[in-house]
Amino acid sequence: MKQEVIQGEDSYCCSLSKEVQEVARLELNETAKVRKKALAEVRKWVRSQPQIKRARLDANFILRFLRMQKFEIKESCEILDKYLTMRCQYPTWFQNLDCQDPALADLVSKGYIFVLPERDQHGRRVIFSRAAAFDPTKYTTSDMMRAHVMTFETLLQNEENQVRGFTYVFDEKAVSWSHLSIWTPSEVSKAFSCCERALPMRHRDINFLNLPWTMSLIFQFAKSLLSEKIRSRFKTHSGLESLQRSVDPSLLPAEYGGKTSVAECITSWKRELEAGREELLELDQLKVDSSAPVGEQLALVRKKSRHDSGSGSEVIRINFSGSIGLFLFSTYSPFPLTDRLLLRC
């Protein structure tokens, strides 16, 4: 089957301000010369891959991966390959990212996950999630995953977001074991496999608010396996005063000390989702030959990762009593490859 192209090669037209271009140069090694050469090399690589049956070659799409990997060609191609594989192998999580889908529309309307209208003091968009708005008796793990991926993919359409990265606020008030128990062991394993550096995002500031003490043990175990660099980006806040020291309070929803109500933030975010809807649905046309098991397809990525120490993944088992039979935490996620934590509950 000859490779098809959904969006072909285009001439890059920079939409970044001078300020953001300087951020890209300093943080991502991006210059006009580097960018032009890198785009050509990745496009050449995509065209040479027989497993990629339907591709995008436009600059906006390819630059997501280059910027994530600071224009390291090999690493960018590896992440792109994995991204395409995950989209095709797990369509219930990565496809039909339609803001008009009843479940997704309901989750957005209830304020489970939305993006604040204004950028923070670092120029980043702020992704806001409220666990209390997710009813584990009504929604599925697929609904949860698609809601998050729909949010990420919509934001990545904007190249300033690709450069700046993202700030997160997770309000964990009312989160309980019932939120975790909807995940089967195989789904948890699959979820972390999917997120193993597959989404081209820069996670810059991660804030947890109202984390229940019952969840703090799991949080601390997962956090302890991260590198110091990543751990430094995690912040826990017992109250609004602490959160407001990390995120400009004027940007937060009114219910959190800001100016704009949650309802207004949701309305604004819905408009953005609608504006990006067609491009998101077009992503479903991407296609790779996913006949080989995920482990085989991604072995090269793991082996060659510049973050891999070469010692393999160490598995740690810790016994708990509780309602969940098995919970897997992998600090791969979007972060450097490290060891895994296996919680047997």
Identify the function of each model-found stretch:
Residues 1-345:
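Basic, amphipathic alpha-helical/coil surface patches used to engage anionic, phosphate-bearing ligands
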